[in-house]
Amino acid sequence: MTMLKLLQRLALGICAGSALAAAGQAQDTQMSIMTGSPTGTYIQIGRDLNNLMQQCGQSLEVVESAGSLENFLGVRQRSNTQFGIVQSDVLEYMQTFASDDPAVARAIAGVRIAFPLYEEEVHILARNDIASFNDLTGKRVAIGVEDSGTFLTASLMLSLAGIEPSETLAIAPGDALPQLQAGDLDAFFYVAGAPATLYSENEIDAEQFHLLPIQNETLEAVYTPATLAGGTYDFQPDPVELVAVKAVLMTYEFDPRGNTYHQASCRGVSDLSSLLLTGIDTLRTDGHAKWQAVDLTDIPPGWDISTCVNRGLDPEYQPNCTQPAPETPQDSEANAVYRRNICAALGC
């Protein structure tokens, strides 16, 4: 499937699903974020944001997904879905095709940036006899499921580099790993912020498999060159040169003066924005390691920040926290008399 056809299918899906978004207006508005697979970085970032919201007495449902394309679709059409994590190359190619294709232009209308996040490394786990990216020619390569950012990135990279595998298989990374280990695949792509749980929590034999270096001038001109530090994974003792793509938190341009669904969603977006700004140090300390690499000023070109996000970042904005303050323990009568006497003598 070509990139244009993939984006057109996305656009048609948005049009077909418009009634679903409208249905959310008649329900109690909840908050949710579209993330990724159970072993990916996106879902851990989503859980960190939910923890942040819970400190304010609110909740953010963390929804598993195929990845970037499904997440973009979810923000546009899924009821009670205010956020989705999306790869910046997905956004870039949507912008490219939007100028020539009205359906794609309609698909991206109303979608906004909430926050830029971090660089995601393109992991390609391969047999050790496959030494370079060019060696994927004629091999059996899994590129992720169709609605994932991994699928789009892998497809673009192979096309840009002129690499033609013997087979490109739409298999999720979590399913591809055992197939690689069984000899049914030669390599598979996985775009995820390191350290990715898939590699850190599974036994991978370094004598059979390695992360493929990606040193290709064409790809390095399109993507960000990156170095995966040695020891990031147990099977990977040495640094690996590869490329990366930025992850971005997307939202929708909810109207704060619109219907009740838009008003409530805008409040939720503003609340999370305010909490993220004031809690970024806590996220960097207690959340996924990728929070330490987040640059909140690195906005992808061609996209605007949501009005509701900017409202939440206003120093005067107060998030709608509903969690009651902890109750002060009540003194017994004897302790109360003691405190009064101490305060009278020493001052309190």
Predicted regions and their residues:
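Pocket-flanking alpha-helical
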Residues: 46, 62-104, 176-179, 195-203
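Bacterial N-terminal signal peptides that target proteins for export
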Residues: 1-12
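Extracytoplasmic
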Residues: 28, 40, 57, 67-70, ...
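Segments of small-molecule ligand-sensing domains
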Residues: 242-348
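Bilobed "Venus flytrap"/periplasmic-binding protein-like clamshell domains
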Residues: 28-54, 60, 120-182
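Sec/Tat signal peptide C-region and signal peptidase I cleavage site
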Residues: 20-26
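A structural signal for short loop-to-beta-strand junctions that line the ligand-binding cleft
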Residues: 103-117, 233-240
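Pocket-lining segment of extracytoplasmic ligand-binding domains
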Residues: 88, 164-265
